[in-house]
């Protein structure tokens, strides 16, 4: 796997969970002899919602909710075959979305 790069993007609603998963990926890649860049924190996406509390009147009474989507990126430079096998066997938390791109 000469001159290749694996880019792993992680998404989660819980920042502790995503940091733990990113650290597991970095530890696994370093243990198998690959160079690692990251984890790089990407901008957090914040979605805000305003909901009327009253079904009829009182337009001023509202509840505010938000969803934060945290993102991290890990680049693995010059991965070995052992690195790819170890990453495939890695069991991450259920609340983390993983996207892998080869470049």
From Swiss-Prot:
<dbReference type="Pfam" id="PF00338">
    <property type="entry name" value="Ribosomal_S10"/>
</dbReference>
<dbReference type="GO" id="GO:0006412">
    <property type="term" value="P:translation"/>
</dbReference>
<dbReference type="GO" id="GO:0000049">
    <property type="term" value="F:tRNA binding"/>
</dbReference>
<dbReference type="GO" id="GO:0005840">
    <property type="term" value="C:ribosome"/>
</dbReference>
<dbReference type="GO" id="GO:1990904">
    <property type="term" value="C:ribonucleoprotein complex"/>
</dbReference>
<comment type="function">
    <text>Involved in the binding of tRNA to the ribosomes.</text>
</comment>
<dbReference type="InterPro" id="IPR036838">
    <property type="entry name" value="Ribosomal_uS10_dom_sf"/>
</dbReference>
<dbReference type="InterPro" id="IPR001848">
    <property type="entry name" value="Ribosomal_uS10"/>
</dbReference>
<dbReference type="GO" id="GO:0003735">
    <property type="term" value="F:structural constituent of ribosome"/>
</dbReference>
<dbReference type="InterPro" id="IPR027486">
    <property type="entry name" value="Ribosomal_uS10_dom"/>
</dbReference>
<keyword id="KW-0687">Ribonucleoprotein</keyword>
<comment type="subunit">
    <text>Part of the 30S ribosomal subunit.</text>
</comment>
<protein>
    <recommendedName>
        <fullName>Small ribosomal subunit protein uS10</fullName>
    </recommendedName>
</protein>
<keyword id="KW-0689">Ribosomal protein</keyword>
<dbReference type="InterPro" id="IPR018268">
    <property type="entry name" value="Ribosomal_uS10_CS"/>
</dbReference>
<comment type="similarity">
    <text>Belongs to the universal ribosomal protein uS10 family.</text>
</comment>
């Amino acid at each position: 796997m000469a001159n290749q790069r694996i880019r792993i993007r992680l998404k989660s609603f819980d920042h502790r969970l995503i940091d733990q998963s990113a650290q597991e990926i970095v530890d696994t890649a370093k243990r198998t002899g690959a160079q690692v860049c990251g984890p790089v924190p990407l901008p957090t996406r914040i979605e805000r919602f305003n909901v009327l509390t009253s079904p009829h009147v009182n337009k001023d009474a509202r509840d505010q909710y938000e969803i934060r989507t945290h993102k991290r990126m890990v680049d693995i430079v010059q991965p070995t075959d052992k690195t790819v096998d170890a990453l495939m066997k890695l069991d991450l938390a259920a609340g983390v979305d993983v996207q892998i791109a080869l470049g």
